Amino acid sequence: MPPLSSEQGGKETLNNSTELFRYCTSVGVYEGYSKKEKAHIVTARMPDDVVNAGGQRFIRHYLDEYQFMVWLVCHATIISEDDMYEAASDLWYECDIQPKKPIIRSYRELREKKLLAMSQAEEKEVSLYEIGTQIQPYTISLSSSIFAQRSFRVLKNALWNTIKGNFLPKEEKKIFKFFSGNKGYTFFDYAKKEDIMENESYLAVGKSIKNLLQKGYMCPVGWCFMPSD
């Protein structure tokens, strides 16, 4: 796995179609998985002292699978460092990636790269969480915009998806129904409604969303949606 590194500026094509939902927090935005780099890409928000010294406000970082899992759990909500470390430790025991990296090393790496949650957002700064919830809503794959852009094959697939939706697992059907009736909503809207951050079911919900993305039932706005033949 590649070591943690960063890149300032620039863009590259990311395959988001089968990856976990775009994940936004007050300190970073999950951009997706790069097959070329074999790494998860996070755009991180740098603190004021870095910007005042001439650095950029946003810098892209590359995380391997284990570092990404730690980052994902640590940023499900803004929590204390003690809780953060405990969550990361629990993940270490569940991790099936070999060889396992020492937990303290990964924790320190993320902290040094400014990827750990801040105790509170800096004053007069718009958080990436707020930006992300505005620019990255989910849309159901059978939306009117999809109909307008695609051919009969898309219509056929979209209608078939609706029929198959009745046979989705309970949790996936619940999520699908929520986004069908709430255009423009994000994962965080669903998380707030179901209070999943408190009952620690966000990873299970994330897996269900990933399944829906893979099956083509829904896709985030701005992502390319191509129904399967």
Segments predicted by a language model, with ranges:
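Intrinsic-disorder/low-complexity coil detector
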Residues: M1-P2, M46
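Long, charge-rich, low-complexity alpha-helical segments
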Residues: I59-D229
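Charged, low-complexity, helix/coiled-coil-prone segments
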Residues: G10-T13, I41-Q56, A148-N157
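Short, amphipathic alpha-helical interface elements at domain boundaries
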Residues: L20-I79
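Long, low-complexity, charge-rich intrinsically disordered regions
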Residues: P2-V27, K36, Y202-D229
